[in-house]
C-alpha cells in the first residue's frame, strides 16, 4: 500500500521538488501552499493540491488530515523555503513583519503537526521539518526568521521525544543556499548593488562555502526523501545539515585563505 505524504509549501522550491520526486516513487502525495503554483505542481505530478490562504499553510494540512482516506504516514513541514519567508528586522518588537516571520516559519509548522498527529501516531509515521542553517547561526537583518528557525529545531526535538514511544519519528534538514524562487529574490539587492547576474550573485554568496555553490532543490529533495524513507527508520531527533559545508567554516580564519 502506498504511503501518504503531506507536503506543506509544495508549490515552489524544495517542496515542489519533493513532490516531483516522491509521487513517481509510489507515494500518495498531497501538497499545500498559499499560491496557485500548488495547482500547477499537482497537475504536473499527479499529486493532490490544497491551496490555503495566508497567513500560513496550516489550513491545507488540516484539510488533508481530516479526509478519511488521507491518513498520512509522513508530513513534510517545509518552512525554509516553501512555506516560510524571511523579513528584515522590525524597528521594535512585535511588529507585523516579526509576526509574519514567526507565523510563516514556526506557527504553520506547529499547526500542521497538530493537525496530522493522530494519523501519524496511527500509522507510526514521521515528520520532516525543512529548516535552515539559520536554525544554527544568525545571519544579518533577519531577526524574526532566525528566531523562528532556531525554535523549529526545538519543535522537532520535542515531537521526537514525546511521540517516539508511539512510533513517530521527527527530523529536520538544514539547507544553506538553495536556488529557489525565494533565494532568487534575495539575490536581487546584491545584483543591483554590484551589477551582477543571478549566477554571479550566487557565486558571490557561496565564495566561502567549501563546495563553492548553492544546492539545487532536487538535491535537497533527495535528502528529504531519505529521511522520510524506511531506510532511515532508526533516525529520529536528528538535524541533517545540507549546506555544502558552509556551517563548518571557521570565519575568523577566512583572512588567511
Swiss-Prot record:
Q: Which InterPro entries match?
A: NAD(P)-bd_dom_sf (IPR036291), Sc_DH/Rdtase_CS (IPR020904), SDR (IPR050259), SDR_fam (IPR002347)
Enumerate the Gene Ontology biological process terms.
Answer: lipid metabolic process; monocarboxylic acid metabolic process
Q: Which SUPFAM superfamilies does the UniProt entry name for this protein?
A: NAD(P)-binding Rossmann-fold domains (SSF51735)
Q: Which residues bind substrate?
A: 132
Q: Does the keyword Ligase apply?
A: no
Write out the catalytic residues in the record.
145 (proton acceptor)
Q: Which UniProt keywords apply?
A: Oxidoreductase
PROSITE patterns from the xrefs? ADH_SHORT
Q: Does the keyword Nuclease apply?
A: no
Q: What does this protein do?
A: Might catalyze the conversion of monoamine compounds or their metabolites.
What is the protein name for this chain? Protein MoaE
Amino acid at each position: 500500500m502506498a504511503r501518504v505524504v503531506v507536503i506543506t509549501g509544495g508549490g515552489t522550491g524544495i517542496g515542489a521538488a519533493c513532490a516531483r520526486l516522491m509521487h513517481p516513487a509510489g507515494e500518495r502525495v498531497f501538497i499545500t501552499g498559499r499560491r496557485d503554483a500548488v495547482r500547477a505542481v499537482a497537475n504536473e505530478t499527479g499529486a493532490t493540491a490544497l491551496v490555503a490562504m495566508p497567513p500560513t499553510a496550516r489550513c491545507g494540512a488540516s484539510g488533508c488530515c481530516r479526509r478519511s482516506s488521507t491518513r498520512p504516514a509522513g508530513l513534510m513541514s517545509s518552512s525554509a523555503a516553501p512555506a516560510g519567508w524571511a523579513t528584515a528586522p522590525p524597528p521594535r518588537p512585535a511588529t507585523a513583519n516579526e509576526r509574519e516571520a514567526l507565523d510563516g516559519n514556526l506557527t504553520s509548522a506547529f499547526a500542521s503537526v497538530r493537525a496530522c498527529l493522530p494519523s501519524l501516531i496511527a500509522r507510526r509515521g514521521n515528520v520532516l521539518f525543512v529548516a535552515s542553517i539559520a536554525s544554527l547561526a544568525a545571519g544579518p537583518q533577519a531577526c524574526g526568521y532566525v528566531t523562528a528557525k532556531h525554535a523549529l529545531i526545538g519543535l522537532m526535538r520535542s515531537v521526537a521525544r514525546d511521540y517516539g514511544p508511539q512510533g513517530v519519528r521527527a527530523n529536520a534538514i538544514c539547507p544553506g543556499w538553495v536556488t529557489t524562487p525565494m533565494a532568487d529574490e534575495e539575490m536581487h539587492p546584491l545584483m543591483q548593488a554590484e551589477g551582477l547576474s543571478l549566477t554571479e550573485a550566487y557565486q558571490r554568496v557561496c565564495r566561502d562555502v567549501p563546495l563553492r555553490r548553492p544546492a539545487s532543490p532536487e538535491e535537497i529533495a533527495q535528502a528529504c526523501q531519505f529521511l522520510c524513507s524506511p531506510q532511515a527508520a532508526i533516525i529520529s531527533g536528528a538535524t541533517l545539515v545540507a549546506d555544502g559545508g558552509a556551517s563548518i567554516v571557521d570565519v575568523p580564519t577566512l583572512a588567511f585563505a
